[in-house]
Structures are given as structure tokens and as C-alpha cells.
């Protein structure tokens, strides 16, 4: 699963994910088709990995998948039954902040129907509403 190799601080602030749109990382850059978020949410490393597996299994051994988001925020929690205070909890999982219009995955090297179906299957594993977009021709 994805997580940072090292960070300056183990515990991070909880960033807001429901404000505004993504102005960078919102276009198809590497592949031909992309999966674009239409709502905002935190996406965990497990959800990213689950979507990646769903996409690659449908595509078989051909084509290439690009993951455009990375879980760099740590979410902390305290054990059940522990009283308030005594510091912040330990990091439990890593999440990526996906704003509206963030490009989540990209696919290239397969037929158009295969790419669309693979991204559709991958979108079911994610907690955001999404749409499949085609690369804009320059």
C-alpha cells in the first residue's frame, strides 16, 4: 500500500477536503483516459490499492495504469476506552485529499472500451462520485 517513506512530522493537521476545486492535477496528462473526481473526500491508501487492483485485473497484462494521487496525510486515532487528553493518538492510516475535478487514475495502451470499463470498475472502489474523461487533443 502507498504511504510516505519518511515524513518530517508523524502527526498532521486534519485538512479540509470539501472546499473548492482542484486547479492543478485536473487534466489527463499521462494516459488516454482518466478517472476524475466529481465530489471531494479523503481517499485512504487501501481504497487506492483496491481500485488499482480492480483496474489492472480487468485490463490483463496489457496497458498501463497511472495513479495520480498519493496518500500523504496521516489520520490518527486513540484506542477505544482511553480517556480524553494525554496527547494526540498514533497514526492509523494514510489518506489523500481528493478535491472536485482531481484526476485520480489514468489508463493508456488498451482499447477504448477496455479502458472505460476498467475505470468504471475502479470507480466503484472509491468513496467519491467520478466520471471518465478523454485526453484533450492539443
Curated annotation (Swiss-Prot):
Residue intervals passing through the bilayer: none
Region of interest (Disordered), residue spans: 1-24
GO molecular function, one term: tRNA binding
Biased composition (Basic residues): 1-14
One cellular component term from this protein's GO annotations in UniProt: cytosolic large ribosomal subunit
Keyword RNA-binding included in the entry's annotation: yes
Any GO BP: translation
Signal sequence region: none
InterPro entries documented for this protein: Ribosomal_uL16 (IPR047873), Ribosomal_uL16_bact-type (IPR000114), Ribosomal_uL16_CS (IPR020798), Ribosomal_uL16_dom (IPR016180), Ribosomal_uL16_sf (IPR036920)
Subunit organization: Part of the 50S ribosomal subunit.
Function, as annotated: Binds 23S rRNA and is also seen to make contacts with the A and possibly P site tRNAs.
Similarity comment: Belongs to the universal ribosomal protein uL16 family.
Protein name, UniProt field: Large ribosomal subunit protein uL16
Name of the encoding gene: rplP
Amino acid at each position: 500500500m502507498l504511504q510516505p517513506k519518511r515524513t518530517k512530522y508523524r502527526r498532521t493537521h486534519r485538512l479540509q477536503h470539501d472546499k473548492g476545486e482542484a486547479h492543478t492535477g485536473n487534466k489527463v496528462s499521462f494516459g488516454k483516459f482518466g478517472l476524475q473526481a466529481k465530489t471531494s473526500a479523503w481517499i485512504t491508501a487501501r481504497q487506492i490499492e483496491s481500485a488499482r487492483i480492480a483496474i489492472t485485473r480487468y485490463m490483463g497484462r496489457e496497458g498501463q495504469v497511472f495513479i495520480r494521487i498519493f496518500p500523504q496525510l496521516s489520520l490518527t486515532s486513540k484506542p477505544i476506552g482511553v480517556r480524553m487528553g494525554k496527547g494526540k493518538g498514533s497514526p492509523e492510516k494514510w489518506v489523500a485529499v481528493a478535491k472536485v475535478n482531481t484526476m485520480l487514475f489514468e489508463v493508456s495502451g488498451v482499447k477504448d472500451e477496455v479502458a472505460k470499463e476498467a475505470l468504471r470498475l475502479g470507480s466503484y472502489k472509491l468513496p467519491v462520485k467520478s466520471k471518465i474523461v478523454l485526453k484533450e487533443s492539443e
